[in-house]
Amino acid sequence: MISRLRGTVLEKDLEDATIDVGGVGYRVNFSSLALGKLPAEGQPVDVRVRTVVREDAFDLFGFLTKGEEEVFLLLNSVSRVGPRLSLMVLSGMEVPELVAALSRGEVARLAKIHGVGKKTAERLVLELKDKVKTIHLEAVSRGTAPAAVSGAHADLVSALLNLGYKQPQAEKAADLASERLGAEATFQALFREALKALRSGG
């Protein structure tokens, strides 16, 4: 099975990216957070990969860090949570923030992630609350709090820049998304709102 890809970013979409390795293009699914942090098209990249094989599909799921990959595997082990939903969860929070929310049993916060809901959030906490404590993430061990608004804003602008938008466009869209959704919104929600603003011209 493919476990790592080192090559060039060929193209990026909203949910996946194609990585050129020796003339072969691999389409890899990423969380929206990871996708926003990928290098620009034409730039070199090195990502960790998990291969999921089903009767009708052969999918690759990519990660920028070992911690992200470990959390994906834990999420995917939960009953009725497949790889796609696992990526949606990873799109809702940075990994240290997500691990902290799971370990503290923050059901309400997890339920706000797009595609999760209360029942799934309760199941995630029930099955993973103790398991995530075995993941040794430096930021979590220090008791990291959720990212500050300024940090989230910078991450959002960076993600938009990596999709090819210009700095003024990205800044304006990030500001609009923050104004419309408020400080409690997840990164994924802000990202979608910013893209909507860019496509509609603000």
From Swiss-Prot:
Source taxon at top rank: Bacteria
Residue ranges of the region described as Domain I: 1-64
InterPro entries assigned: DNA_helicase_Holl-junc_RuvA_I, NA-bd_OB-fold, RuvA, RuvA_2-like, RuvA_C, RuvA_C_sf
Function: The RuvA-RuvB-RuvC complex processes Holliday junction (HJ) DNA during genetic recombination and DNA repair, while the RuvA-RuvB complex plays an important role in the rescue of blocked DNA replication forks via replication fork reversal (RFR). RuvA specifically binds to HJ cruciform DNA, conferring on it an open structure. The RuvB hexamer acts as an ATP-dependent pump, pulling dsDNA into and through the RuvAB complex. HJ branch migration allows RuvC to scan DNA until it finds its consensus sequence, where it cleaves and resolves the cruciform DNA.
Compartment(s): Cytoplasm
Lineage: Bacteria, Pseudomonadati, Myxococcota, Myxococcia, Myxococcales
GO biological process: DNA recombination; DNA repair
MF annotations from Gene Ontology: ATP binding; four-way junction DNA binding; four-way junction helicase activity
Self-association state and partner proteins as the record states: Homotetramer. Forms an RuvA(8)-RuvB(12)-Holliday junction (HJ) complex. HJ DNA is sandwiched between 2 RuvA tetramers; dsDNA enters through RuvA and exits via RuvB. An RuvB hexamer assembles on each DNA strand where it exits the tetramer. Each RuvB hexamer is contacted by two RuvA subunits (via domain III) on 2 adjacent RuvB subunits; this complex drives branch migration. In the full resolvosome a probable DNA-RuvA(4)-RuvB(12)-RuvC(2) complex forms which resolves the HJ.
Domain notes from UniProt: Has three domains with a flexible linker between the domains II and III and assumes an 'L' shape. Domain III is highly mobile and contacts RuvB.
Region named Flexible linker: 143-147
Family that this chain belongs to: Belongs to the RuvA family.
Region (Domain III): 148-202
GO CC annotation: cytoplasm; Holliday junction helicase complex; Holliday junction resolvase complex
Name under which the protein is recorded: Holliday junction branch migration complex subunit RuvA
HAMAP family reported in the protein's UniProt record: DNA_HJ_migration_RuvA
Span list, region Domain II: 65-143
Record keywords, A-Z: Cytoplasm, DNA damage, DNA recombination, DNA repair, DNA-binding
Gene that this polypeptide is encoded by: ruvA
Organism: Myxococcus xanthus (strain DK1622)
